[in-house]
Curated annotation (Swiss-Prot):
It comes from Bacillus cytotoxicus (strain DSM 22905 / CIP 110041 / 391-98 / NVH 391-98). This is D-alanine--D-alanyl carrier protein ligase. Transmembrane segments: none annotated. D-alanine binds at D197, V301, K492. Pathway: Cell wall biogenesis; lipoteichoic acid biosynthesis. ATP binds at T152, S153, N292, T293, Y294, G295, P296, T297, D383, Y394, N395, G396, R397, K492. The keyword ATP-binding applies. Pfam families: AMP-binding, AMP-binding_C. It catalyses: holo-[D-alanyl-carrier protein] + D-alanine + ATP = D-alanyl-[D-alanyl-carrier protein] + AMP + diphosphate. Belongs to the ATP-dependent AMP-binding enzyme family. DltA subfamily. GO terms for biological process: lipoteichoic acid biosynthetic process. One of its GO terms (cellular component) is cytoplasm.
């Protein structure tokens, strides 16, 4: 499969079919082709002998999708950067990626970036002035060339750029279309920001099958009235989100088959799917199939899936995350480096063509997490799990990396930035669970010198600093102040003791 060719055929076969909808803005497959062609032609003329990645900044604007395809047609991987990402983090991505160009689909609020920036208006001008120009198809990203690079949390305080090739994405997309029984021309929910790789689960299966992406932005999510008004008119048939987002929607009693009468498939990834959420969805949408999936960004979105039936719910207290896609395989590795038997816990290792080629510009980090097994790329996930007759069960993180509301983050990165704040002498992040999954982050802080009379004022000052360094979803919800942090005899932070103290 050549991904771009599959997407472009809809511009010929169904040119007026809507490819993407966001609020009052929409684009057809013909517009998507014409504008991405124009942009690719401009990029190739400006950067003729260059294949450095291109940053694409914005939120849910149609120009984001156009820019992604324009970059790839010109032979450049794209780096999606959501406008919610703090300026400091955007700067670090720009510096570490080697990008020379940033395309802005929204107003750019970050200044002093070491890259050339194309404003929202200038982007529109490029679409207009280069209209009708066809890029050289030989320039397009192909095979093992990078298609996109998504930055995830890094333990040193610096984000890591996960490189996903054309072949990685083709492997995922072909499997998703077949395994999830996706049909031509369906309407897909697009809820995850493009800088979160869950969005790939809807973008490319939709575009390859001539579907329509229906985007829900963060402002809608913050205003349930707007959210459900949009869902009502969407006619969504394929739902892609974290379980947390579906759980939030289930709090609205009208969120059911009556609101979305043609709902066919729920696709969940990014965090644990609780049994209760699956049960409620089955009650509200009796005709829909619920798919539970698993996979890290480093293995292209997801590599396992299972339909969650009543039998599965009745059989398992914690839902399994599924069977591996046919072109990949899973190994459960014990601490001694041997492969675990059925039912034995260990680290989940993913082997096959879905696996990333590594972290951009970080050979040491790549060597630590990626390897070759029997001539194929393999990724050591750091996730704990076990297999039973080919079925994978996920048991959380082996290290201090967690998933909170679908976002993966390393607690050490948050601690790194928290300790760098004024008024903070020492700090540890404690993730607090509610049932099976993480509910919020608690910051246990040893304060430095300060003149605040009340703890809440100190907390506000620390949060203000953190907001300049970290995305909102990585900011701890609660703060607790102590005179010291408990330590183990080895001189390490005693996290178990700390957790027992704060949850007692």
């Amino acid at each position: 499969m050549k991904l771009l060719e599959q997407i472009e055929k809809w511009a010929t076969e169904t040119p007026d079919q809507t490819a993407f909808v966001w609020r009052d803005a929409k684009i057809t497959y013909k517009q998507l082709k014409d504008d991405s062609d124009a942009l690719a032609h401009w990029i190739s003329s400006e950067y003729p002998d260059d294949s450095s990645p291109i940053m694409v900044y914005g939120h849910m604007q149609p120009d984001m999708i156009i820019s992604f395809l324009g970059c790839v047609k010109a032979g450049h991987a794209y780096i999606p950067v959501d406008l919610s990402i703090p300026a400091d983090r955007v700067l670090r991505i720009a510096e570490s990626s080697g990008a020379k160009l940033l395309l802005s689909a929204a107003e750019l609020t970050v200044t002093d970036l070491p890259v050339r920036t194309v404003s929202q208006n200038n982007l529109k001008d490029i679409f207009f002035t280069h209209k009708g120009k066809i890029p050289n198809p030989e320039h397009a990203v192909k095979d093992d060339e990078n298609f996109y690079i998504i930055y995830t949390s890094g333990s040193t305080g610096n984000p890591k750029g996960v490189q996903i090739t054309h072949n990685c994405l083709v492997s995922f997309t072909k499997w998703a279309i077949q395994d999830f029984n996706l049909q031509t021309g369906q309407v897909f929910l697009n809820q995850a920001p493009f800088s979160f790789d869950l969005s790939v689960m809807d973008i490319y299966p939709s575009l390859v099958t001539g579907g329509t992406l229906w985007a829900i932005d963060k402002d809608m999510i913050a205003r349930p009235k707007d959210l459900f008004a949009s869902l009502k008119q969407s006619n969504i048939q394929v739902w892609t989100s974290t379980p947390s987002f579906a759980e939030m929607c289930l709090m609205e009693t009208s969120f059911s088959e009556s609101m979305l009468p043609n709902m066919k498939t729920f696709l969940f990834c990014g965090e644990v799917l609780p049994n209760e959420v699956a049960k409620k969805l089955m009650e509200r949408f009796p005709k829909a199939t619920i798919m539970n999936t698993y996979g890290p960004t480093e293995a292209t979105v997801a590599v396992t899936s299972i339909p969650v039936t009543q039998e599965v719910i009745d059989t398992y207290q914690s839902l399994p995350v599924g069977y591996c896609k046919s072109d990949c395989r899973l190994l459960i590795m014990k601490e001694d480096g041997t492969i675990a038997s059925d039912g034995e816990k260990g680290e989940i290792v993913i082997v096959g063509p879905s696996v990333s080629v590594g972290y951009l510009g970080s050979p040491e980090l790549t060597e630590k997490s990626f390897t070759m097994i029997d001539g194929e790329r393999a990724y050591k996930t750091g996730d704990a799990g076990y297999m039973e007759n080919g079925l994978l069960f996920y048991n959380g993180r082996l290290d201090f990396q967690i998933k909170l509301h679908g976002y993966r983050m390393e607690l050490e990165e948050i601690e790194h930035h928290l300790r760098a704040c004024s008024y903070v002498e020492g700090a540890v992040i404690v993730p607090i669970k509610k049932g099976e999954k993480y509910d919020y982050l608690l910051a246990v802080v040893v304060p430095g010198e300060h003149s605040f009379e009340k703890e809440f004022k100190l907390t506000s000052a620390i949060k203000k600093e953190l907001n300049e360094r970290l995305p909102n979803y990585m900011i701890p919800r609660k703060f607790m102040y102590q005179s010291s942090i408990p330590m183990t005899p080895n001189g390490k932070v005693d996290r178990k003791k700390l957790l027992s103290e704060v949850t007692a």
